[in-house]
Amino acid sequence: MYKVIVFAGTTEGYEISRFLSENQLPVLACVATEYGSKSLQENSCLHVQAGRLDEQQMRNLFFREKPELVLDATHPYAADVTQNIRNGCE
């Protein structure tokens, strides 16, 4: 179970994911592509999941992991992803 799920599509998303894991918070960083996953190095507190998720897949992920916090650090133009994250959290 991850305390935080970060949707990382920006440099800031990668930095947030690293910061949280360095402070011993279990983080799942979701990135859209394999290329994006190369920007993060997994460790005992950081797991990286590559692949685009639709709203239902996000709901399933949130139900399964029961995170305390979900962060949207996707690209500002990724409005559809932001809406899916918001809907998935409801």
Which residues make up each language-model segment?
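Short, polar loop motifs at secondary-structure junctions
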Residues: 31-37
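Glycine/small-residue-rich loop that forms an oxyanion/phosphate-binding "nest" at active or ligand-binding sites
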Residues: 63-90
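Glycine-rich, highly charged phosphate/nucleotide-binding loops
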Residues: 44-63
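Active-site-proximal loop->helix
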Residues: 38-43
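Glycine-rich Rossmann-fold phosphate-binding loop(s) that bind the pyrophosphate
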Residues: 9
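Hydrophobic/small residue at the entry helix of a nucleotide-binding pocket
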Residues: 12
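Extreme N-terminal starter segment of soluble prokaryotic enzymes
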Residues: 1-4
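A short, Lys/Arg-enriched amphipathic alpha-helix followed by its capping loop at the start of a domain
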Residues: 16-27
